[in-house]
Amino acid sequence: MSIASRLTSPLLLAVGSATIAAAQPASGRDVLQRMHDAYAGKWYSTLRFVQKTTRYGSGGAPTFATWYESLRQTPDGQTQLRIDLGDPTAGNGVLYTADSSWVFRGAKLAAARPEGNEFLPLIEGVYMQPVDATMRQLATTNVDMSRVMHGTWEGRPATVIGIASPADSVSPQIWVDDERNVVVRMLLRPTPSSPPMDIHLGDYVHVGDGWLATKVAMTVDGKPVQTEDYADWKVGMPLPADLFTTNAWSARGHWATR
């Protein structure tokens, strides 16, 4: 659950993987409210899984790694995501919220940054918190919430937040499956001048009373940047608070070390 760079793939629209049909527009806020209401009081508050991460260098050669990811909704309403980069006992990883991140090396804090994880409001927060909070957290994506189109994604009805024309394949945008009320695609930019990253969330499985995308693929300028394949997922179990502290990185009680 990380965002590496960013891109759009115009070929996707050309070959019909993504098609958009004009329909009566609604606001992005209304779409987020629909997502929230569909699972209010039902969505899981904890999640953990093993992630096979494949990254592609400038020459296209892949490198492989195993990450261990733990997510929880805190009592005060925050979504936290801990990513252990390799063996949790090595102490290397990142702790994310929607607006901040803390990088650890050898179990010591190496950096604290005012940039968060843009996935979190869309895969967890939207179902657990007031929509106004989700709107604030998504402001940094620069998705235009006043623009909405309806269409299809991989043969399923979808709503696209952030565009007003079927020809727009470059503006920041969020695609939401109409039946499941989950995000299936995002186009996001790190800076206004950089190409967007095209992020696909797929292979959804029903977990608890919600859903989990078990494969994420990211491309920039049509070239793969990172793919994520999830395994051994579980929801609804207790996660030790020690896994989510920002002043220390501890593997004590980590589910992957038991």
Task: State the predicted function of each range.
Residues M1-L11:
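Bacterial N-terminal signal peptides that target proteins for export
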Residues L12, L81-L85, S171:
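Residue-level detection of beta-strand scaffold positions
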Residues L13-A23:
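Hydrophobic h-region of N-terminal signal peptides that target proteins for export
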Residues Q24-Q33, W43, S100-V170, P190-P196, ...:
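Flexible, processing/modification-adjacent segments and terminal tails
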Residues G28-A110, D144-S146:
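N-terminal mature ectodomain segment of secretory-pathway/periplasmic proteins
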Residues K52, D87, H150, E154-S250:
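Gly/Pro-enriched, hydrophobic low-complexity segments
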Residues E69-Q73, A98-S100, G116-L120, D178-E179, ...:
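A short, sequence-level motif marking secondary-structure junctions
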Residues T74-T79, W102-R105, P121-V126, V184, ...:
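Short, surface-exposed linear segments at secondary-structure transitions and domain or protein termini
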